Amino acid sequence: YEIYQCDWSSDVCSSDLILYFMQGGLSLPDEAYYRDDQYQPIRTALIEHISKMAQIAGLEISGTSVLELETKIAGFHFDQVKDRDAMLTYNKLSRAEFEALCGGFDISTYITASQVDPKFFNEVIVREPQFFEGLGTLFSNFDLSAWKNWALWHLLSGAAGYLTEDLVNQNFAFYGTTLSGTPKIRERWKRAISLVEGSIGEEVGKEYVKRHFPPTSKAQVQQLVSNLIAAYRQSINELTWMSPDTKTKALTKLSKFTPKIGYPDKWRDYSKLQLTETDLMANIKAIAKFSRDYELNKLAGPVDRDEWHMTPQTVNAYYNPGLNEIVFPAAILQAPFFDPDADDASNYGGIGAVIGHENGHGFDDQDRKSTRLNSSHTD
């Protein structure tokens, strides 16, 4: 559980690895659930859900207190519109500026406890400054019992999916059915696969690629991507409404697109992850520690341009503005999107649309503002 989120990634305006601080601390999807009248039934259901979970676990947790505190926290959140604004959420601050912003929240103690070299806090990106300013006011008027109650709830809620059947089912009744409208929980084996996917996804990916994505398919898709980038280049050149200066910038950015096809060139090493067949929670803790150590190790060097943020067996694709890359996992490079034996028209109409969509993200209302023109060949 996190009152706020902290992660490191490439700075969209430079090649540096930098810490990002983001809002958090809520049990419901976003701040609107705490203020809009239409969500009053959801808020009531949350209180009831917390009470039931606490009863099953044999704990004393006040759902009303959790909701009251989270309503205050939500009041400092950016709404969804602000939170996707690339300019509003790019706030680079020095450590002194960040400490001043947080006020009553002692960020120095956090830095010490994080076990991260303090030099990485010399400059950070704060996505939602008003949240951290508000958090400082909450900590200036600290209600210990309310925060202990909140922390106990989030500890239970975060682990609920791995505990007893009653807790698993009650957790799903609220988050799966009440919030999401899903009537029935997935079979246990499917949930187990999801856990494995989220924990050692690239290890599974190796086997998936071996079975379903031969080198010949990768070569075909690489040619498709190259052709579609060429078509995009031609389209930009032929635009009559775009100024010459803007065209030059757009073409420069397009020329530095880095396509990633199918699977990573360098697989993640899981050899230090020790798991057991008899203790699920011990495995969850081991996975959490392994993941944290993996993230901390990133700070020892430059941005890892070989890293993927989806596994090969994921049916999806993405554009990464920080590295100006378009990424297509092997699982989306299957029928009906792509078939190595199909004619070109079929593949351009299928995976071609996906490739064009991801290309377009580099020039959409937010990612066009990413001025860093990264590629795997230049810096």
Predicted ranges, named:
Residues 21-23, 330, 375:
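Pocket-edge structural micro-motifs
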Residues 2-6, 34-35, 111, 176, ...:
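Compositionally biased, intrinsically disordered low-complexity regions enriched in proline and serine
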